[in-house]
């Protein structure tokens, strides 16, 4: 009698059970890993665009606004989607059609949310003054909150 190579039903069931246990353990760790990657990327992108907005304000001697945006052209209050920086010629902290967009970047957070706690005026943007490049009345703290973890991380 010849033996045919293959797996018995018992071997297949045990293998699938072991794979399911490993997947159950690995899935939360994967989410935690992706949240930490998103945190590092957000911190890097924020630092780059804050420095770029400050540089543009000093270089052009005009106020530059860095703010969150949904459509990459107007400011809103959601820091999770994207950022824009523009020259604010009329000093109203909102982008008009004639004001040039200097940079825009999509953030698209999936594993957490980004918040900006501002000191001073309640508008949700950072203004870099053209004479010094300093963020007058715009200082604050960026905080990244993971959806699955209990602790928050201060970025900048």
Q: Positions of the model-derived regions?
A:
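N-terminal helix-rich module
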Residues: 25-40, 47, 55, 59, ...
């Amino acid at each position: 009698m010849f033996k045919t190579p293959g797996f018995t039903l018992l071997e297949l069931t045990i293998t699938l059970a072991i794979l399911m246990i490993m997947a159950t353990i690995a899935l939360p760790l994967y989410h935690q890993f992706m949240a930490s990657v998103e945190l590092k990327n957000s911190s890097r992108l924020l630092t780059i665009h804050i420095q770029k907005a400050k540089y543009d304000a000093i270089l052009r001697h005009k106020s530059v606004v860095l703010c969150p945006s949904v459509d990459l052209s107007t400011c809103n209050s959601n820091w999770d989607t994207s950022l824009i920086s523009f020259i604010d010629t009329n000093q109203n902290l909102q982008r008009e059609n004639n004001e040039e967009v200097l940079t825009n970047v999509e953030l698209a957070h999936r594993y957490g949310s980004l918040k900006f706690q501002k000191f001073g005026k309640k508008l949700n943007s950072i203004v870099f003054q053209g004479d010094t490049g300093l963020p007058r009345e715009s200082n604050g703290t960026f905080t990244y909150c993971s959806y699955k973890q209990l602790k928050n991380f201060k970025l900048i």
